[in-house]
Amino acid sequence: RGGSDERFAQVSAFLPVNGTIDLDSIRSFRATLENAFVQNSIFAPEPDAQDPGADTSARLYADAYSGSTQLSVSGKSPGSVTVTAIGVGGDYFLFHPLQLLSGGYVSDEDYMADRVVLDAQTAFNLFGSSDVAGMEVTINGKTFPIAGVVKSEDDFATAAALDAGAKASSDPTGVQSASKAMIYMSYAALNAMAELPIDCYEIVLPDPVSGFAKKLMTEKFPVGEGVIVQNTGRFSLSGLISVIGKFGKRVMTTNGVIYPYWENAARMAESYAALLLILGTLFGLMPAVCLTIVLVKLTVREIKRGYYKAAHAIEDRVEENKRKHYVSGGI
């Protein structure tokens, strides 16, 4: 999204459930990041003063942060529904450009941080329609205007990740306390209801040399026992080979990180892509292997045939010499 002659990379940080990252931590990291850019002589491009239509909004990075929890929401229909609420900040919908069905997104530029975005399932459960931008929902006794309605991703990996998340939140009797229905709202507004740790931080930043962006994040971002993942090049050949090398170990997590649904979906897609790479390689090699086997068999057959011919020829020559010897000797 957007364009530039510079190299950029997208990197995500996933934080453990006992993490202490908050808005102050994000602001502090941004200051540290900008200082690191200066130290490495990385600057945002200056707009052309001679061009009145030049873009003056150029920046070196874009970031987003989020945290999630469960809450009850009520709307026009009687009763309430339990949803997964994601508190978002920064350019969240730049990283997650969900399709809008009505209205618009929420952002840090909003005058009031009290608007929400519903997904289609939540909108249907509460109002029976997705065209509900401008209406209101009630959360903890407070009303929130609806900024817009989005359509959640419908690919197989996301569906599986959402199902897994709902099952993981089931109570001991097996009843799901979580729902695949979702609502998005300002992180500040959601955090004001109950202290909500930030569990995901995402950023696009310069990567002048391959690996620079991830290294900078690893060294400067207070990830603690969390995980840093570079999404750029994730599904490249080298990236999938790396997944194959860690196959099996990927499911063993001991760092206390609960990945958001989009990362679980990405990891699932990675595993499938790696499996397809293995199968594609095997099927690609199979004709060559079969041809090699056939050639080896033909070669061995010809060698054996030549050996038998040579052996018979030698025997015939020996017999011929014996016959000549007997004839010449009068035997």
Residue ranges and their predicted role:
Residues G2-S28:
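Membrane-interface junction motifs in transport/secretion proteins
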Residues A266-A288:
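N-terminal membrane-entry
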Residues F8-V17, D63, I198-P208:
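Short, hydrophobic/proline-enriched secondary-structure or compact coil segments at domain edges
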Residues I21-D48, A181-I183, S210-V223:
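Well-ordered, non-membrane alpha-helical segments in soluble/globular domains
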Residues G90-L101, L118-L216, K220-R267:
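Mid-to-C-terminal secondary-structure elements
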Residues L285-G330:
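Juxtamembrane interface at the cytosolic side of transmembrane helices
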